[in-house]
């Protein structure tokens, strides 16, 4: 069989969607090192899997049970790596900028300033002239 088409396999697995699932499961098994039942002929694993299904050289019930087992298994949660931990909110300022809080404002003496005095202090801090 030079080329495998879905029509070659439909007689064995009438549902095309199930055929795709079974062939993909078998191809994953071949990638894990399971034994071939047909000659590879320089074909890739999905094509070999379809050829095995078409030639009826594999037991489909075994592939179905492997498929169900792989889908029923809950994946293990991945441990949070350092990059993900950096995205989790913390008490620290993540941007490395100075936090300005009410306590710090009070310690700088800006709490009792009027708007004009505050503007003048900002201009002086920035090296500019206060507008009047």
Swiss-Prot record:
This is DNA-directed RNA polymerase subunit omega. Gene3D superfamilies: 3.90.940.10. It is an enzyme of class 2 (transferase). GO terms for molecular function: DNA binding; DNA-directed RNA polymerase activity. It catalyses: RNA(n) + a ribonucleoside 5'-triphosphate = RNA(n+1) + diphosphate. The lineage of its organism: Bacteria, Pseudomonadati, Pseudomonadota, Alphaproteobacteria, Acetobacterales. Signal peptide: none annotated. The RNAP catalytic core consists of 2 alpha, 1 beta, 1 beta' and 1 omega subunit. When a sigma factor is associated with the core the holoenzyme is formed, which can initiate transcription. Keywords: DNA-directed RNA polymerase, Nucleotidyltransferase, Transcription, Transferase. It comes from the Bacteria. Residues 100-119 are annotated as: Disordered. Promotes RNA polymerase assembly. Latches the N- and C-terminal regions of the beta' subunit thereby facilitating its interaction with the beta and alpha subunits. HAMAP family: RNApol_bact_RpoZ (MF_00366). Its EC number is 2.7.7.6. Belongs to the RNA polymerase subunit omega family. GO terms for biological process: DNA-templated transcription. InterPro entries: DNA-dir_RNA_pol_omega, Pol_omega/Rpo6/RPB6, RPB6/omega-like_sf. NCBIfam families: rpoZ. It holds the Pfam family RNA_pol_Rpb6. GO terms for cellular component: DNA-directed RNA polymerase complex.
């Amino acid at each position: 069989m030079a080329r495998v088409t879905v029509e070659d396999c439909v007689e064995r697995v009438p549902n095309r969607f199930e055929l795709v699932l079974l062939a993909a499961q078998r191809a994953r098994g071949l990638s894990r090192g399971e034994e071939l039942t047909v000659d590879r002929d320089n074909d890739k694993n999905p094509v070999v899997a379809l050829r095995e299904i078409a030639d009826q050289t594999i037991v489909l019930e075994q592939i179905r049970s492997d498929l169900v087992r792989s889908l029923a298994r809950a994946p293990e949660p991945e441990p949070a790596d350092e990059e993900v931990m950096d995205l989790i909110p913390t008490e620290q300022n993540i941007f490395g900028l100075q936090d300005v809080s009410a306590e710090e404002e009070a310690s700088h003496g800006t709490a009792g300033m009027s708007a004009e005095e505050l503007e003048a202090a900002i201009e002086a801090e920035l090296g500019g002239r206060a507008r009047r």
